[in-house]
């Protein structure tokens, strides 16, 4: 990864800054040798969404071939099923995904660690919290760093990648040391 600054559109917009910092963290972690990113969380989210949309598409298609009075039951069942799928999707995002931005497996010789990285910026706050958690053969560890976004972004609204990389590496090294 190049150490060029990444431009942020509006440094006062919390969600934009969080997304930009998350992308930088993902790029840094993807560049680590021996890491394989896992897309299981996103794949399950897509599957739940696809099932909900499939119910909607079936309802539209069925209504096209069997106009409304005959299709009333199918439309009702498909509509309720769609909203149930969207409720499941929302619960999945709240309780399973949480704020996870990156999942990966690190293979180190014969051992492997499963990593989950998450981030958070509270509304109307300038504190960016980066959390990491790993699991390996019954052992686990977790840690986090909380700093002002001003530590990573200059006055022009550019993310200073080397500073973010240093924080990510420090958090990673701290967790690896605590494991041993």
Curated annotation (Swiss-Prot):
One annotated GO biological process: signal peptide processing
Entry's localization field: Endoplasmic reticulum membrane
Record flagged with keyword Membrane: yes
Keyword Cytoplasm attached: no
One Pfam family named in its UniProt record: SPC25
Membrane topology qualifier: Multi-pass membrane protein
Cytoplasmic compartment segments: 1-45, 94-180
Keyword tags: Endoplasmic reticulum, Membrane, Transmembrane, Transmembrane helix
Lumenal side: 67-72
Chief localization: endoplasmic reticulum
Protein function: Component of the signal peptidase complex (SPC) which catalyzes the cleavage of N-terminal signal sequences from nascent proteins as they are translocated into the lumen of the endoplasmic reticulum. Enhances the enzymatic activity of SPC and facilitates the interactions between different components of the translocation site.
Family from the record: Belongs to the SPCS2 family.
Protein name as annotated: Signal peptidase complex subunit 2
Source species: Caenorhabditis elegans
Gene name in the database record: spcs-2
């Amino acid at each position: 990864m190049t150490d060029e600054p990444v431009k942020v559109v509006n440094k006062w917009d919390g969600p934009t800054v969080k997304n930009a910092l998350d992308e930088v963290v993902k790029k840094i972690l993807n560049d680590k040798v021996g890491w394989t990113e896992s897309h299981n969380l996103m794949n399950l989210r897509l599957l739940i969404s696809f099932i909900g949309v499939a119910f909607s598409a079936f309802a539209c298609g069925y209504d096209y071939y069997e106009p409304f009075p005959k299709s009333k039951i199918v439309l009702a069942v498909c509509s309720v099923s769609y909203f149930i799928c969207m409720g499941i999707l929302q619960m999945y995002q709240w309780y399973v995904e949480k704020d996870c931005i990156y999942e990966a497996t690190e293979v180190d010789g014969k051992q492997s660690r499963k990593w989950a990285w998450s981030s958070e910026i509270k509304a109307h706050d300038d504190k960016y919290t980066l959390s990491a958690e790993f699991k390996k053969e019954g052992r686990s560890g977790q840690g986090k760093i909380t700093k002002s976004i001003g530590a990573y972004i200059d006055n022009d609204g550019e993310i200073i990648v080397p500073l973010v990389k240093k924080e990510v590496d420090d958090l990673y090294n701290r967790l690896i040391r605590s494991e041993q």
